[in-house]
Amino acid sequence: MLTYQVKQGDTLNSIAADFRISTAALLQANPSLQAGLTAGQSIVIPGLPDPYTIPYHIAVSIGAKTLTLSLNNRVMKTYPIAVGKILTQTPTGEFYIINRQRNPGGPFGAYWLSLSKQHYGIHGTNNPASIGKAVSKGCIRMHNKDVIELASIVPNGTRVTINR
């Protein structure tokens, strides 16, 4: 199971929202949470595998506007991406793919991979000319063919590291 380290400012509700699970499910998996959260505390996120058992890793470089997929610490492929604009920057840190949806509609293109930060994901686009630019509302945009390929390879629980 995925273990999450509580950060300063996290609440039970914010963690549940980020991982798209109920607070009841979090409490059931972590009875000690009845006493409250403490920064640095490790909690189990039910329904997701231990990400360190998954051989894939995604590294996003905001500055280079690239997404690099690795298998067992060896680069498989690097994709061009679009990232958040100045007022809606792409968040940095370590996240996990927690769910996915094919053909989500609207500007999200052919696929949506939800990250463990509410409202953020890796997705396709209905505007391929935007790839390589800082134009999104914080999400990571890919060409549709690329996000379909990525989604066919990586399972839920895959670690996604985003750096400036």
From Swiss-Prot:
Q: In which pathway does it act?
A: Cell wall biogenesis; peptidoglycan biosynthesis
Give the enzyme class: transferase
What GO molecular-function term can you cite, just one?
peptidoglycan L,D-transpeptidase activity
Query: CDD domains, per this entry?
Result: LysM, YkuD_like
- Which GO biological-process labels does this protein carry? cell wall organization; peptidoglycan-protein cross-linking; regulation of cell shape; sporulation resulting in formation of a cellular spore
Record keywords? Cell shape, Cell wall biogenesis/degradation, Glycosyltransferase, Hydrolase, Peptidoglycan synthesis, Sporulation, Transferase
Cellular component terms per the entry's GO annotation: spore wall
Q: Which residues form the LysM domain?
A: 2-45
**Localization annotation:** Spore wall
Keyword Hydrolase among record annotations: yes
Q: Where is the L,D-TPase catalytic domain?
A: 56-163
Q: In which domain of life is the source organism classified?
A: Bacteria
Annotated active site: 123, 139
Q: What's the EC number here?
A: 2.-.-.-
Is Transferase included in the keywords of this UniProt record?
Answer: yes
Under the heading InterPro entries, the entry gives:
LD-transpeptidase (IPR050979), LD_TPept_cat_dom (IPR005490), LysM_dom (IPR018392), LysM_dom_sf (IPR036779), Transpep_catalytic_dom (IPR038063)
Please name the Pfam families in this protein's record.
LysM, YkuD
What else the UniProt entry mentions is:
Regulated by SigK. Could also be negatively regulated by GerE. Transcribed by SigK RNA polymerase.
Q: What is known of its domains?
A: LysM domains are thought to be involved in peptidoglycan binding.
Q: What does this protein do?
A: Probable enzyme that may play an important role in cell wall biology.
Question: By what name is this protein known?
Answer: Putative L,D-transpeptidase YkuD
